[in-house]
Curated annotation (Swiss-Prot):
Annotated source species: Leptospira interrogans serogroup Icterohaemorrhagiae serovar copenhageni (strain Fiocruz L1-130)
GO MF term list: ATP binding; ATP phosphoribosyltransferase activity
UniProt remark on domains: Lacks the C-terminal regulatory region which is replaced by HisZ.
KW Cytoplasm (keyword) present: yes
Name this protein carries in UniProt: ATP phosphoribosyltransferase
Name of the gene this protein is made from: hisG
Oligomer and partners: Heteromultimer composed of HisG and HisZ subunits.
Gene Ontology cellular component list: cytoplasm
Catalysis: reaction(s): 1-(5-phospho-beta-D-ribosyl)-ATP + diphosphate = 5-phospho-alpha-D-ribose 1-diphosphate + ATP
EC number in record: 2.4.2.17
NCBIfam families named among the record's database cross-references: hisG
Protein function: Catalyzes the condensation of ATP and 5-phosphoribose 1-diphosphate to form N'-(5'-phosphoribosyl)-ATP (PR-ATP). Has a crucial role in the pathway because the rate of histidine biosynthesis seems to be controlled primarily by regulation of HisG enzymatic activity.
Gene3D superfamilies listed in its UniProt record: Periplasmic binding protein-like II (3.40.190.10)
Matching InterPro entries: ATP_PRibTrfase_cat, ATP_PRibTrfase_CS, ATP_PRibTrfase_HisG, ATP_PRibTrfase_HisG_short
Length: 206
């Protein structure tokens, strides 16, 4: 049986597709100029759904896809009911607390204003620190928020730290180490067990 796999558009999809080609699950890459969001590989092993990164887990959880590849940060933020059997060790980054130079948590005595795309993980971080915070959920350009007075600090993904540095921000703490995870809904993990196990075993040999 064919596996339907949800992939996030962008760099992680490209890395995932390269990995599957190297393992013999795909014969070729989808046409980068195509507007089609479903790719049926000629080998007949995999059908790919190209979706937004935040939507991968929903497609899998609701059985619109058997499996998906998603960042650990997205999975932890959403709290999805999925099997997460494999860390693919690609798409590595970290979710970090960052702020302008001079800001410290210890010296902050009022409610801390935090801008982030990850309100649940940010709230949990400050709760465990015993600090009160006000969360502003943003969808992009998170680094801008403390520069214009919207927030005191940010919680955002960091790869190299170059964007933080360019905007006068420094990394204060790492909240979560993230990488791409292969996820399955439990129905497909049972109903397509042979294909699922073969797929996992193949990708685990990186």
């Amino acid at each position: 049986m064919m596996l339907t796999l949800a992939l996030p558009k962008g760099r992680l999809a490209e890395e995932s597709i390269d990995l599957m080609i190297s393992k013999g699950w795909l014969s070729s890459k989808p046409d980068p100029n195509s507007k089609e969001l479903i790719y049926n590989d000629p080998k007949g092993k995999i059908r790919i759904l190209l979706v937004r990164s935040q939507d991968v887990a929903t497609y899998v959880e609701q059985c619109a896809a058997d499996a998906g590849i998603s960042g650990w940060d997205v999975l932890k933020e959403g709290g999805y009911d999925l099997a997460t059997p494999l860390d693919l060790k690609i798409g590595k980054c970290r979710l970090s607390l960052a702020a302008p130079n001079g800001f410290t948590l210890e010296a902050h005595h009022r409610k801390i204003r935090v801008a982030t795309k990850y309100p649940n993980l940010a709230r949990e971080f400050f709760f465990l620190k015993g600090l009160s915070c006000e969360i502003f959920k943003l969808y992009g350009s998170i680094e801008l928020a403390p520069l214009v007075g919207l927030s005191d600090c940010i919680v955002d993904l960091v790869s190299t730290g170059g964007t933080l540095k360019a905007n006068g921000l420094k990394e204060l703490d790492i909240i979560l180490e993230s990488s791409a995870r292969l996820v399955f809904n439990r129905s497909s993990l049972y109903g397509k067990r042979k294909e699922a196990v073969e797929f996992m075993d193949s990708l685990s040999k990186i």
